[in-house]
Amino acid sequence: MPRDRSRSPRASKNPTATFDTTKGKFEAEIFLDRVPITASSFIDLCKSGFYEGLHFHRVIPGFMNQFGCPHSKNPKSDRAGTGGPPDGTFKNLKTGGTEKRSNGGNIKDENISRDPNAPGTLSMANTGRPNTGGSQFFVNVANNDFLNWFSPGASKHPVFGKITSGMDVAVAISKVRTRDDNPIEPIKMKSITISGI
């Protein structure tokens, strides 16, 4: 008789995020099992509505699409790319403990999972210094292994999710016309919906 592995302690069902943009929808698995602080912070921001109405502020063809700065609510703001979430606390959805955002909404780096910055992955943006990730992240549309936290070099960007459907939408966003990497035609995030948690 086959075993029901869904009840096994090894079985892991991560939450899904559905991104509804003005260019279409895509879905991603969020790696709560692997990077619980990063994933829990992202989910908390999604559920609070933090990301709604923000625009992709940095798009580079063959590289990535960056998103999540509160200043990008105005797609023409010259401050887009410089902001983050407010300081505060959020629940670690894996452990049940309390985590915090501090020093400008930053969270602790989670350099534990060796998921590479491969096409379709969601990865934390930062200032280039440790523990400076907040709300900004990017969608890789190419193999950007030089950004892996475990690769040599200064750039360290932990992956916290991967697109499971709608990769064509992410690629289409990466190909829009830009000026100084900012899309000429603004691309807005209408909503991010979390399911499975």
Residue ranges and their predicted role:
Residues 1-197:
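Cyclophilin-like peptidyl-prolyl cis-trans isomerases
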